[in-house]
């Protein structure tokens, strides 16, 4: 079975790699080449610089993020190295796509539903279209028959499955070592996020802790390699995720919890989202709404005894393992794929 997917989020795409290639034995492909953009089939936005970053072979990003198209061509396929997840992606040009038979096309943003349906109508009449929903998009009125959602469940009339995006639990796991006095953020472009003031205020009133801000355009730069990201999480006392807008899925929160580390989080943004199932105030997380008095958060952290903190870490891990079962979800996904319309 061959599946073609768009590519806009590295963590999401790697989760599709783990699902379709590693678990199901399918072949997963993504686009490469600016023809996708020029002919209207890549519609993340209308900026050519962004399109070049995602589609142009050998492109070097202008920010400090890692290149997305570093690889080589073999026959009609480009083999792209995923430096962060240490895997390889198969990418094809639009011309190769037209001459290859696919069973499924997967769109992961609403802007791609219409162009992907056009691709099916013109070149892949045998293929089925899946909409993979990783954020809380408004999909009212969109022509979606098959929904694969890594969000909190909601009402949908059609073929559907709700699941968690997979990541490597052999890497994101407890280290067995006590953490350092570190509080770490993995919020991209933190200085333009609503939680920025909370972060810098907490850092200012807690000089006994080291604060790190990782991600695109962040003070401490991007972290390359999931093993390095996991090590930083394992070494951190808390994750900082006071983020405006929240996340549909919430990779960072799930990663921290899998490592057995509690997070400082704006609970109101997440309580009704998928990651919210992991969050129990004062058990797996410390609540800090955007604009809150951060001195209260600092006091709560400082008042924890070693046993209380160790209990929070164990609760975080236990809650993750209670909510996330990739093997069980695989069975539901197989049924969903067998019922594609």
Residue positions per predicted region:
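N-terminal pre-catalytic "stem/leader" segment of glycosyltransferase-like enzymes
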Residues: 1-118, 123-128, 287, 326-339
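Catalytic core of nucleotide-activated saccharide and alditol-phosphate transferases
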Residues: 96-201, 324, 328
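Conserved active-site histidine-acidic residue motif and adjacent donor-binding/catalytic loop
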Residues: 215-233, 246
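Short alpha-helical segment that forms part of, or immediately flanks, the ligand-binding pocket
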Residues: 230, 253-258
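Acidic donor-binding loop of glycosyltransferase active sites
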Residues: 231-248, 261
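Short hydrophobic beta-strand element within catalytic cores of glycosyltransferases
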Residues: 262-272
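A charged, aromatic-enriched C-terminal amphipathic alpha-helix characteristic of glycosyltransferases
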Residues: 292-295, 306-341
């Amino acid at each position: 079975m061959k599946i073609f997917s768009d590519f806009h989020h590295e963590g999401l795409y790697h989760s599709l790699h783990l699902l379709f290639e590693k678990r199901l034995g399918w072949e997963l492909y993504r686009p490469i080449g600016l023809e996708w953009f020029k002919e209207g089939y890549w519609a993340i936005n209308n900026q050519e610089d962004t399109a070049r970053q995602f589609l142009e072979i050998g492109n070097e990003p202008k920010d400090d993020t890692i290149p997305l198209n570093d690889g080589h061509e073999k026959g009609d396929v480009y083999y792209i190295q995923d430096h962060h997840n240490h895997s390889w992606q198969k990418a094809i040009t639009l011309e190769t796509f037209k001459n290859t038979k696919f069973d499924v096309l997967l769109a992961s943003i609403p802007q791609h539903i219409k162009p992907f349906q056009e691709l099916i109508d013109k070149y892949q009449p045998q293929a089925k279209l899946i909409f993979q929903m990783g954020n809380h998009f408004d999909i009212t009125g969109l022509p979606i028959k098959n929904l694969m959602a890594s969000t909190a469940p909601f009402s949908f009339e059609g073929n559907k499955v709700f699941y968690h995006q997979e990541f490597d639990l052999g890497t994101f796991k407890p280290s067995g070592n006590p953490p350092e006095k570190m509080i770490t953020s993995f919020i991209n472009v933190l200085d333009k996020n609503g939680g920025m003031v909370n972060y810098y205020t907490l850092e200012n009133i807690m000089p006994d802790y080291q604060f790190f801000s990782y991600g695109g355009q962040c003070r401490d730069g991007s972290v390359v390699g999931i093993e390095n990201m996991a090590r930083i999480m394992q070494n951190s006392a808390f994750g900082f995720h006071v983020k405006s807008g929240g996340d549909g899925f919430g990779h960072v929160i799930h990663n921290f919890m899998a490592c057995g580390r509690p997070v400082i989080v704006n609970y109101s943004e997440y309580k009704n989202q998928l990651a919210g199932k992991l969050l129990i105030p004062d058990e797996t997380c410390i609540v800090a709404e955007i604009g809150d008095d951060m001195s209260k958060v600092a006091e709560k952290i400082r008042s924890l005894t070693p046993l209380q903190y160790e209990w929070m870490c164990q609760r975080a891990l236990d809650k993750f393992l209670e909510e996330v079962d990739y093997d069980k979800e695989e069975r539901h996904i197989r049924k969903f794929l067998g019922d594609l319309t």
